[in-house]
Every structure is written in C-alpha cells, then in structure tokens.
C-alpha cells in the first residue's frame, strides 16, 4: 500500500503542469500508461492561443464559442482566455521557446480565429512544451513517476476518491492512496 498527498493520472501537459504548480511539501505520484513521452500532448503540432491584449477578450471569446457551436461553458472559456497570458509566461519561464518574429513573438491566425493569437514552437509545439515540463518535473524531489501503469479503478468511498487501483507492466495490481486524485488523461485516456 502506498500513500501520497496527490495522485496524478496522466503525463500530458495538464498532468505535468499540475505537478509543477503544487506545493513542494506535497508528496506526488504521477502515473502514465506508457512512457513519459508517450502521450498526445507530445505529438501535438498546433499552437497555443493567447489573449494579445484587453481589446482581444471579446473577439477571442466569440471565436471560441463559435468554434464550439456555442455549446461551450462560457465561464470556463472566459477563465481560459483570462489566464492564457499567465500560462504562456509560465511556459516561457520553464524554458519553452516559442517562435519569434523580430524582437517579439510570431503570432499566427488559424482555424476559427479572427485575429493572429496563436503561438507555435515550429511544428513541434507539443514536443517542445512536454519536453520542458518533463525535465522540470524530473527535478522535483517530492514527485515519483510510475510509467507503464494503467488505471484500473478509482478507490471511492461515499462521495470521495481516496486513490486508485493500478496495474503495472507485469500485470500486478496495487492500491495507491491519496488525499487528492487528479485525472489528466486527455481526450482518450
């Protein structure tokens, strides 16, 4: 039986970024079904949308809602937009090298966007970001990583998750207990 403060399932951008932003006094376990690099975030070639300035909020919101056929959670979209520059700044601080144009960044206009607000790392944005996040996570003394481990079930009692049942590469099942469990499995898990 293993006990952690936080259990993170998934090693894409969301799982890794979460680990980097949790308190260093928390014991964290990150679990991935393959290797650290074996995820869709690593393969992503597209860019990241960022609010360019305050005047861009409404157009960015409308572009995103329209692209989602207005089925989006508007409050969640607004939060994403409002936090986008802070996230980009954090990624830059972690060493992510976005494409430059002159002294600034090279913003592109793609898909449903009405303005140029997309940042890239050549055509390997996902690989660039994930590689930098992986390197930073590996430096954390409070983080353990289980590769080649599959989530079998969540350990739930009442209305609270207490961890997960994992299967390792050899097929052995083990319970991992945590005060908090974060599912960062992406679109396909």
Please place each PLM-identified region on the residue numbering.
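Core beta-strand elements of the Rossmann-like FAD/NAD(P) dinucleotide-binding domain
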Residues: 2-4, 170-180
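N-terminal Rossmann-like FAD-binding beta1-loop-alpha1 element of flavoenzymes
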Residues: 6-30
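Structural detector for helix-capping/boundary residues
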Residues: 11, 149, 179-180
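Residue-level detector of alpha-helix initiation sites
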Residues: 12-13, 35, 188
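Conserved N-terminal/central alpha/beta ligand/cofactor-binding core
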Residues: 32-161, 166-168
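Residue-level marker for beta-strand->alpha-helix junctions and adjacent short loops that shape enzyme
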Residues: 152, 171, 188-189
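Glycine-/small-residue-rich beta->alpha transition segments that form the dinucleotide
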Residues: 178-180, 184-189
């Amino acid at each position: 039986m293993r006990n952690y403060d936080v259990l993170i399932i998934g090693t894409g951008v969301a799982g890794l970024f979460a680990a980097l932003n949790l308190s260093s006094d928390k014991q964290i376990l990150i679990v991935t079904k393959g290797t650290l690099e074996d995820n869709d975030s690593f393969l992503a070639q597209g860019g990241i949308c960022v609010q360019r300035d305050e005047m861009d909020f409404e157009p960015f919101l409308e572009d995103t809602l329209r692209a989602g056929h207005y089925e989006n959670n508007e409050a969640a979209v607004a939060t994403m937009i409002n936090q986008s520059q802070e996230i980009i700044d954090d990624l830059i601080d972690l060493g992510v090298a976005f494409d430059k144009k002159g002294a600034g960044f090279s913003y592109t206009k793609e898909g449903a966007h009405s303005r140029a607000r997309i940042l890239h790392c050549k055509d390997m944005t996902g690989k660039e970001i994930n590689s930098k996040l992986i390197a930073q996570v590996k430096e954390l003394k409070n983080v353990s990583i289980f590769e080649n481990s599959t989530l079998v079930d969540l350990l739930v009692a009442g209305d609270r998750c207490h961890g997960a049942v994992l299967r390792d590469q050899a097929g052995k099942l083990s319970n991992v207990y945590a005060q908090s469990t974060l599912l960062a499995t992406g679109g396909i898990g």
